[in-house]
């Protein structure tokens, strides 16, 4: 899973 989406 991309942790980049956790920024939202």
Curated annotation (Swiss-Prot):
Compartment list: Secreted
Role played: Can act as a modulator of exoskeletal and cardiac neuromuscular junctions.
Modified residues (Phenylalanine amide): 8
Biological process (GO), any one: neuropeptide signaling pathway
GO terms for cellular component: extracellular region
Protein name (Swiss-Prot/TrEMBL): FMRFamide-like neuropeptide 4
Key words, A-Z: Amidation, Neuropeptide, Secreted
Source superkingdom: Eukaryota
């Amino acid at each position: 899973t991309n942790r980049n989406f956790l920024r939202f």
